[in-house]
Amino acid sequence: MALENKLGLTSSADLAREEERISKKKAAQLFDRKLLDTFNVGTFAGLAAIHMYLFEDIFDFAGEIRTVNLAKGNFRFAPLMYLQAALENIDKMPQSNFDKIVEKYVEMNIAHPFREGNGRSTRIWLDHILKNEIGKVVDWSKVDKEDYLLAMERSPIKDVEIKVLLKGALTDEINSREVYMKGIDHSYYYEGYTTFKTEEL
C-alpha cells in the first residue's frame, strides 16, 4: 500500500516512479533557478525549505515535522517526544569546518525529521552547508552506495567512516551543473530510485 499522497496513487510502485520523476525535476530547479541561495544554511528551516520544494506536489507533509516514530531495521530515529529539542540543538551546532559539518549532518540523519524523503533532502542540505562554509561539495558519483549506507548506519556510534568517505569525494566544482545533477541521480540511487536521469527531465 502506498503512502498517502496528492497524486491519488495507491500502488507503491506507481508512487515511487512518480515521486522520483517529480522530485528529481524539482531538485534540478533548485540548482537552475538558484533557489538554494535563498534558503538558510545549516538549519532545520533550510532543510524544511528544501524538503518542501522537492515534495510539495506529492505529499501534504512536505516540509513538516513527522508525527510518527520511525525506524529502519533495528535503528530507531529520534523519538517524537525529543524531535523538536533535537532539531533546536542541531541548529546550534557549529559548521565552521568539514568535521563539524559532517557531525551536524549525522545528527540530522538521526533526527530524521520527515515522514519520507529524509536522505535525499538532507544530502542537498549537506552540500549547501559545505558550499557556503568551506567552498566544497561532495561529488556523490564517487561515493559507493554500499560503503555510504554502511557508514551512515554506523555513524551514530562512530562517524569516522562517513567523514573519510565524504572527504575523499570532495570537489571544489561547487557551481558545476554536471556534478550537481549526477549527484542527485546518485543520491536517489542510494534509496533505490533509478528510473529517470535528472538532466533528462
Tell me the role of every PLM-derived stretch.
Residues M1-L201:
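FIC/Doc superfamily catalytic core
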